[in-house]
Amino acid sequence: MPAKKNTAEKKISKPVKKDIPQLYSPLLKTYFSDLTSANMIYTKIVRSPITKGRIKSLTLEDIPEGYFLFTAADFGEENYVETLDIQTEILASSEIYYKGQPIALLAGPVFTDLLDLEKNIKMEFEKDPASKIKEKEYPYAQRFIRNGKAQKPEEFTKLFSKKNYDIKGTWTSVLNAPSCNEANGAFCTFDKNILTISTPTQWPKHLQENIKRIFNLKTEEVFIRKTISSGPHTNTIWQNTVIAVMASLVAIKTGKTAQLVLSREEHFEYLIKKSPISIKIRSAVKKDGIIEAVQVLIELDSGYHNPFAAEILDRLVIAANNIYSVRNIEIIAKAYESYTPPVSFNIECIDSQAFFAIENQMQKICNVTGFLPDELRMKNFERKFSLPFTFTNEKVREAFSAIEKMYDVNRKFISYRMESKNRKIDIKNLHNFPLRGIGVACGFNGIGYFGSNIFACNQKMEATLESDGTLEIHALQPSASTLEVWKNTAAQILEIDPKQIKLNSIFDVNEDLSVPENVYANVSVMTYLLKKCCQDIQSKRFRKPLPITSTKGFTSAQKKVWNKEKFSGSPFFLSSFGTVVLELEINPYTYKIYIKNVKAVLNAGKIGIPKIAENSVKLSIQHALTELVVDENLHCDQISVSFVQSDNDPTQIDGLISRILPAAFTSALSQATGHEINTIPVKPQHFFKEMISNENSVYSK
């Protein structure tokens, strides 16, 4: 969606009137599964038991009164949800593409009866053999980058000559954090031709447009009440619409209130489960530590018909070389379809697996060449030649300098490296002192991605200074801490009391809310736009009569810094940067991992409330630690967080730790064990076997 004009002035404010049909209304602090009605019926999704094939027949005989079975035929020709120009069947009409694909809906007043009825459904399928990947020679999405003097394959090969270090690594990661959120679903009523949907939607416009088309309803006949969201994953953004459409069909066809709640297993398997990504990196490193060339191969199993596959792949490519200046870069990235559910990614750290790979590769280069972590990184930062991607990396050197001065990283790194090199692990003769390691990792968090229509900074912020001196902010409901930042920001610019500022989170059908909530809710972007609104109002308030309304969005000039066709330039509106140092010990008898300390230095612009920001980062660190080892919840009592002083606009802190801490952990673990740990989450039995085998040393190429 093209950005609208950056400024807008209106003489009359836009209060939400009761007679204006509403597209979106927040139902705060309410879970949809807590809603109930006297004539409510439950809905259960019937899923395919086969992986690949066709439905020959699907019948249920002797359906009790008050119970219903719905199939694809009940949707007619509109049996699909459209997302980013990709059509996904709501219920399989014939072809089956993955095990668990929805094929029917059961509805009735007693949920346990639905479980019994499901067992009585007679299903006949024509099965086909299903390979793991559908067609590997035809990727579902792909991206190829080659930058530098070496433009031909043979020229690239020459860079990996004997005079340079030729260092290869394969890094695999997938962190599926346990979800404590409500399982997804919807609560729908259809009364007097008005469809009301209560659901944890994160993309109300997407839901509304699909509902209108599928059921032939007018805009004013669809009312969406947003309940508490279930997490910022790509599948929860668009598949919530699929689920809400299913519940809506039941409500419309039966005339009863319909509730559809996924089971905890369904919510994980089909909405939030992520897929492992293996990234292969080959680095040509000169004797002076300069990385002359890097080759990266990213292969992603995106599942069946994933509308976000290209988006995910592009973000991985952008992060694949981190902030480093390498003269010759080749990145090949491919996403393949498979006979599995569409893969989901966490929007807040969509590129974390790329950072895990490149930062572990940097640590491996340190191990092989003997350079120190900060020394190697600074040798390959801000070199003067053209790169495909540019980032706002102010004060990166200051961050590394602060880490070394404050935490004595280099001395510990050298000491632990000597211990590791000289240690010979013998299962019959364990040492009586802990195995120690220290890991360093860095990375950025790009805010406001210009690379696609849906994540292309299409956000808008509207603020109105009313006649009575109060300020109304028209935006989606943010977190309590973010709202406090907004009020303080606006109050300071307009010189009013924060108590005079109120939030309006109701959007009527005539207002455009075309991008997902996760995009609108980006704290840094929306705070920036609010600041611009307030500055605009302040410049006019003594020359124009109140009320004054200002609407701000991103200008075309701001978006032109990224060339979408050439896939080059500055991909983000803002970037935050962070460095993490993690120190650990391993008990030589129990092989239990003890996190001694975690140190983080972050550059996130001007920090409004430092204590809140510090506590937020500490919570992020503790949360990230719980995901690193299978069946273990690591924690740390010694966490230190520092912020680089800056007067720039504040940038995003959330998601930064989850991008860089995993690599710091595996780097430290590799040093402690003396063996390369290239997969996360870590299985304790895996590194135990590695250690006693005395193979796969971190000091080999």
Show where each model-derived region lies.
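Divalent-cation
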Residues: 403
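Cofactor-binding beta-sheet edge motifs in enzyme active sites
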Residues: 2-398, 414-701
